Amino acid sequence: MITEKDKNIILQFAKKYNVSYIILFGSSIRKEREANDIDIGVKGIEPRLFFKFYAELFKYLSKPVDLVDLSKKSLFNELVEETGIRICG
């Protein structure tokens, strides 16, 4: 599970970059153990801003970030959408 501080940082940057929504998934949402990284799915960010968004999250969050662009259709992205937890949007 991620900290409230990390969640607030994610929400702050989601607003800054005007994303449609953010989904946490993987170890980021499991309560039984501490996550080694923060798994984030994002939809609605402009492609030219994706890596800037990623860099800011990587800089300010307490753990490494895995960022997935959910605007691309794939089985993995469908799984993230079905099993993850939406925290904004």
Predicted regions and their residues:
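Catalytic core of pol beta-like nucleotidyltransferases
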Residues: 1-23, 29-35, 44-89
